[in-house]
């Protein structure tokens, strides 16, 4: 992309206007581009091509397993490694339990990306329905999805149960 731009072509970078993304996958591709590329290279592609071969009869399940490996397991792996002190002391289980909220965030992210990918496939390459109101609704949906799952993704001292009660309170269920 950089070389094309040097030659005068007005090509957008892959991170162009992430807040105007109309799907979860599009936002993930734009906002977390380099992190996403690492997850795709080290988790999604090896899972899809390796163990995923046994799931050829079930393409949706194969895609889900590969997306789950990248967006959940790979993402969680990154966040566990950031807790180097407890891991160095051998407290692996404690490190995982300390990241319960992040694990739930990763599960929701993986499911959201998978559903978004299925919607993109269902459209079969055709553009999304036109209209300013529909476009705004799709953008609002992406923002709402990420704002909602960020309840569990943000770092802080709130335990998993408190975050879940907060979310349920937003819905009037707690």
Per-range role (PLM):
Residues 1-174:
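Membrane-embedded transmembrane alpha-helical bundles that form the catalytic cores
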């Amino acid at each position: 992309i950089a070389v094309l731009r040097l030659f005068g072509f007005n090509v957008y970078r892959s991170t162009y206007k992430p807040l105007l993304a109309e799907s979860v996958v599009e936002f993930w591709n734009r906002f977390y581009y380099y992190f996403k590329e690492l997850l795709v290279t080290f988790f999604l592609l090896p899972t899809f091509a390796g163990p995923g071969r046994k799931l050829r009869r079930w393409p949706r399940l194969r895609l889900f397993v590969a997306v789950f490996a990248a967006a959940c397991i790979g993402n969680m792996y990154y966040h566990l490694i950031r807790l180097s002190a407890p891991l160095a002391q051998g407290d692996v289980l404690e490190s995982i339990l300390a990241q319960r909220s992040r694990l739930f965030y990763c599960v929701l992210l993986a499911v959201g990306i998978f559903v978004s990918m299925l919607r993109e496939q269902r459209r079969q390459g055709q553009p999304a329905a036109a209209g300013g109101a529909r476009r705004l609704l799709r953008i609002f949906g992406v923002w709402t999805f990420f704002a909602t799952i960020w309840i569990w993704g943000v770092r802080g001292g709130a335990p998993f149960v408190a975050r879940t009660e907060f979310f349920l309170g937003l819905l009037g269920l707690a």
